Amino acid sequence: MQLFHLCLIISCSCPTVQASKLCLGWLLGMDIDPYKEFGATVELLSFLPSDFFPSVRDLLDTASALYREALESPEHCSPNHTALRQAILCWGELMTLASWVGNNLEDPASREQVVNYVNTNMGLKIRQLLWFHISCLTFGRETVLEYLVSFGVWIRTPPAYRPPNAPILSTLPETAVVRRRGRSPRRRTPSPRRRRSQSPRRRRSQSPASQC
């Protein structure tokens, strides 16, 4: 919590730890979920185990390889691009802060505690954010949401009643446990045949080329 208070001191311009605690109370009173505007929730992401998410380094390399031009562009590409930019910048600032704290702590045990806290707690949140937005850009938001729902249903189903393998994002919708209901195409109901009039009519002569 000391590191978190230090973050709040910097971000909230609070000069003391006591002031940062007030800022912390204000933040905890707000219901902010970074996934809400994208149709997901923190709880939905929490169904995925922590070892599911690649390392931050791998995720950053993936984002750079696939979307570097768009991320560095001054143009607004999509909400996912914007959120991905913010997550990358946040991780960079967090690494800078953690390095500064580690270099200024004389106690080796305290330095180790700071590193473990950043990697275990904050690192997991950043990995979740990076994975979510990279996946949305790669596979589409609807596919990612369908995957999260399917995985959540799969992981909460007793092993005896669920498929042996978890859903795989890259193979949806084939491996989806629950599929979203889509609009089924309208079926045209056959119209009742009209009765032909009993009066004789002259039939049109059809050429062979006009027949289907």
UniProtKB/Swiss-Prot annotation:
Q: Name one GO cellular component term.
A: host cell nucleus
**Signal peptide (from-to):** 1-19
In this chain, the stretch annotated as 3 X 8 AA repeats of S-P-R-R-R-R-S-Q covers 184-206
Skewed-composition ranges (Basic residues)? 178-205
- Propeptide found at 184-212
Q: What post-translational changes are documented for it?
A: Phosphorylated.
List the Gene Ontology MF annotations in alphabetical order: DNA binding; RNA binding; structural molecule activity
Q: List keywords of the entry alphabetically.
A: Disulfide bond, Host nucleus, Host-virus interaction, Repeat, Secreted, Signal, Viral immunoevasion
Disordered: annotated segments: 172-212
Region of interest: HBEAG: 25-27
Chief localisation class: secreted
According to its UniProt entry, the protein's GO biological process terms are:
microtubule-dependent intracellular transport of viral material towards nucleus; symbiont entry into host cell; viral penetration into host nucleus
Spans of the sequence repeats?
184-190, 191-198, 199-206
Q: Which domain of life is it from?
A: Viruses
User: InterPro entries under this entry?
Assistant: Hepatitis_B_virus_capsid_N (IPR013195), Hepatitis_core (IPR002006), Viral_capsid_core_dom_sf_HBV (IPR036459)
Q: Where is this site: Cleavage?
A: R183, S184
Instruction: Give the location in the cell.
Output: Secreted; Host nucleus
Pfam families associated with the record: Hep_core_N (PF08290), Hepatitis_core (PF00906)
What family is it from? Belongs to the orthohepadnavirus precore antigen family.
What does this gene product do?
May regulate immune response to the intracellular capsid in acting as a T-cell tolerogen, by having an immunoregulatory effect which prevents destruction of infected cells by cytotoxic T-cells. This immune regulation may predispose to chronicity during perinatal infections and prevent severe liver injury during adult infections.
Name of the featured protein: External core antigen
According to its UniProt entry, this protein's organism is: Gorilla hepatitis B virus (isolate Cameroon/gor97) (HBVgor)
